UniProtKB/Swiss-Prot annotation:
Domain Protein kinase: residue ranges: 240-493
Protein name in UniProt: Tyrosine-protein kinase isoform SRK4
Residue ranges of every copy of the SH2 domain listed in the record: 122-214
Top-level taxonomy: Eukaryota, Metazoa, Porifera, Demospongiae, Heteroscleromorpha
Pfam families assigned: PK_Tyr_Ser-Thr, SH2, SH3_1
Organism of origin: Spongilla lacustris
Localization (cell): Cytoplasm
Length: 506
């Protein structure tokens, strides 16, 4: 498939089941939904929003959100809101706590329960150590920037990650049976917030005192463009304005667009006759449920008339292939390995969902700000008309990226995706070089059957080449899982499970 483009993104859930509440009059037990009248007073009560008469949980904005439709509620990071209803799942109905009392739908992953741990700027939840290091080492974070995350190994415990001068230090935060927390046993705290407040004032054994929360690289993606678009994701073409072409693939064009006059999106327009609309909608309904920070979010489709529109998030730098051949030429090995680990993370999620990509290649991986990579076009190859695919590519699929069992017998599995990932590793480490240079598709297929594998590219570490070769094992069952590939690449430059941790227990 040709490359599709998408925007920034990320991942904080901010979900909770209970919230802080507002003191109010009791609900009438006899008439549901009506409010008990207050006792008569000499003076009339002040005018307040109706929501304050009911005990609704209070949530706080974790990110800025600008309304996309008339049904949405805009808010800023730190704004307080009453959550009126959570029945809509990913989109909650809320009322602003300010005197205006505006109402509307909000993305549930943009808010957190007021005064909860999730509401703290420095709490990142389920973030891996390597991701914490990556974020803290970004140029916009400084000495003493920090975050607290869930422990990688011990449920209920936490880890404190702090930016030192040129590296990140990690400290284990443990919980005692009495519910207190500590970094060192000589000093315990009633809450994580108290611990942070203490170490903000003095280092007391840390590499530096805590200066400020780690700044996030991207906001999380919302579930769909809006509440309505999430439920009825077939949208009208008149809602989309195509702004500028971003490129053309085998089966259509990619555009930067604007949805509803408010939201930047990427639009893939498919050439008429490319696929059966019925089969596409069946596959797209599955694709829309696949959500992961390293997968491109499918927002909506337009299938009432051709060309079909596929609407997704917009990524600033386009395909990984073009990025590597252009602005990415200056990337060093750690950046290249990190980008590969991001792809493996997204594919590991597909693996867990028993979903097969079928066309994994650098052209189908997109790049955003801060070298964020996301897998795109997963599943589309399955619904492309076979005759058209053959006419465009000279084969039913791109041979040089395809595992031999898939190329010869159409045996597509997650293990054939692993083979393709090995080719992606080659593309990345060579800054976008075409695989099997100088060989035709027929020659490649013949040579692979005779156990030929591409030699180690210049500048490629032996350790990385060994991972490539594992991906290209003849027996699909012998190839690694994407889960294994993900941690191998994440830990590529570390030594030992406890690397980077400082033990302050004493």
């Amino acid at each position: 498939m040709g490359s599709c483009c998408s925007s920034q993104d990320g991942d904080g859930n901010g979900k909770a089941t209970a919230g802080s509440t507002v003191d109010s009059h009791e609900l009438s037990q006899s008439v549901k939904g009506k409010i008990k009248q207050p006792e008569p007073k000499p003076k009339p009560p002040p005018q307040v929003p109706p929501a304050q008469d009911v005990k609704y949980p209070i949530y706080v904005g974790k990110y800025d959100y600008d309304s996309r439709t008339d049904d949405d509620l805009s808010f800023k990071k730190g704004d307080l809101m009453y959550i009126i209803s959570t029945d809509e799942g990913d989109w909650w109905f809320a009322r602003s706590k300010d005197t205006a009392g505006k109402e509307g739908y909000i993305p549930s992953n943009y808010v957190a329960e007021y005064k909860s741990l999730d509401a703290e700027e420095w709490f990142f939840g389920q973030v891996k150590r390597v991701d914490a290091e990556k974020q803290l080492m970004m140029p916009f974070n400084n000495l003493g920037s920090f975050l607290i995350r869930d422990s990688d190994t011990t449920p209920g415990d936490f880890s404190l990650s702090v930016r030192d001068i040129d590296r990140v230090r990690h400290y284990r935060i443990k919980k005692l049976e009495n519910g207190t927390y500590f970094v060192t046993r000589r000093l315990t705290f009633q809450s994580i917030q108290e611990l942070v407040a203490y170490y903000t004032q003095q280092a007391d054994g840390l590499c530096v005192n805590l200066k400020g929360p780690c700044m996030v690289m991207e906001k999380p993606q919302t579930a769909g463009l809006s509440k309505q678009a999430n439920e009825e994701w077939e949208i009208e073409k008149k809602q989309i304005k195509l702004l500028r072409g971003l490129g053309a693939g085998q089966f259509g064009e990619v555009w930067e667009g604007l949805w509803n006059g408010t939201t930047s999106v990427a639009v893939k327009t498919l050439k008429p006759g490319t696929m059966s609309i019925e089969e596409f909608l069946e596959e797209a309904s599955i694709m829309k449920q696949l959500r992961h920070p390293k997968l491109i979010q499918l927002y909506a489709v337009c299938t009432k008339e051709e060309p079909i529109y596929i609407v997704t998030e917009l990524m600033k730098h386009g395909s990984l292939l073009e990025y590597l051949r252009g602005d990415g030429r200056s990337l060093k090995l750690p950046d290249l390995v990190d980008m590969c680990s991001q792809v493996a993370s997204g594919m590991s999620y597909l693996e867990q969902q028993n979903y097969i990509h079928r066309d994994l290649a650098a052209r189908n991986i997109l790049v955003g700000e801060h070298k964020i990579c996301k897998v795109a076009d997963f599943g589309l190859a399955r619904v492309i008309d076979e005759e058209i695919y053959e006419a465009k590519l000279g084969a039913k699929f791109p041979i040089k990226w395809t595992a031999p069992e898939a190329a010869m017998y159409s045996r597509f599995t997650i293990k054939s995706d692993v083979w393709s990932f090995g080719i992606v590793l080659y593309e990345v480490i060579t800054y976008g070089r075409f695989p099997y240079p100088g060989m035709t598709n027929a020659q490649v297929l013949e040579q692979i059957q005779q156990s030929y594998r591409m030699p180690r590219p210049m500048g490629c570490p032996e350790k990385l080449y060994a991972i490539m070769m594992d991906c290209w094992r003849e027996d699909p069952a012998s190839r690694p899982t994407f889960e294994t590939l993900s941690w191998q690449l994440e830990e590529f430059f570390t030594t030992g499970d406890d690397a980077g941790y400082k033990d302050m227990e004493r």
